[in-house]
Amino acid sequence: MDFVILAGGLGSRFVKEGYECPKPMVPLFWRPMIGVLIDTLMECGADRIYVGANARMPMLLDYLEELREKGLPVEVRPIITDNSYCTLKAASEGIEGKFIAMTCDAIFPTDEFKDYVKAVAEAPADTALMGLTRFVEDESPLYARVSESGEVVDYRYGGEPFAESTIVSAGLYGLSGSIMGVIPALGLEPESLSDFQRLLAVKTPVKVMPFEFTIAFDVDNTRDRLHAEEFLGKWK
């Protein structure tokens, strides 16, 4: 399986807390969080790992180059984009088959992710398999609406959950090159990853199906970082 890591953000909340390194380099267990994620992806059978890395982060670019020189299948794509969807589009450009995309701060159980990789590989070509979770810790989660037939039919950013259930995006996206091509082919221009997910579910013929994780969250501040180390310690 190919993986795409989005590492374009500086991490404004970490900056406010006094961190001097860019967000992907914030440590988990004394290692950059993006390195911890890459180790997990290797454990889950990575064929190729594409990293959309902010071109203004030399510390990150140097670190990724070190990993590549050590033989890891990392392809660095230096980017400067307007929003998170544009980062996804640039980082995944040229991938024809299936891939799983995520941000550099994604935290999830490794065993469940292995099952997710298998499910994405086996999903029909016209189906996007999106990670969801009932573990809601984010201040402004992206709520998902799942129909009675089990299909994701809408998303809502912040506010109240849909009436059907409280379930949110896990920040894990099972996609393909052909699915990525549907959005621009319809003349749609998502303003963010959240907008991309909603447009994919509401405005395109792509079938969007859920894959549920017991726990999944992003690392946006020191509190999240400590939680991530606690959870990863248990899962490992």
What are these regions (language model features)?
Residues 29, 55, 80-83, 214, ...:
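Short beta->alpha linker loops
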Residues 121, 151-236:
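Catalytic-core segments of class I nucleotidyltransferases/pyrophosphorylases
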Residues 25, 144-146, 208:
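A structural signal for short hydrophobic beta-strand segments in well-ordered beta-sheet cores
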Residues 1-61:
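N-terminal glycine-rich phosphate-binding loop and ensuing alpha1 helix
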Residues 60-61, 68-147:
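Conserved beta-loop-beta/alpha segment of the NTase-like Rossmann-fold superfamily
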Residues 9, 105, 221:
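Active-site glycine-centered loops adjacent to acidic/histidine catalytic or metal-binding residues
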Residues 13, 36, 59-62, 86-90, ...:
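Phosphate- and divalent-cation-binding pockets in alpha/beta enzyme and binding domains
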Residues 2, 47-50, 73, 98, ...:
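Residues at the starts of beta-strands that form the adenosine-phosphate
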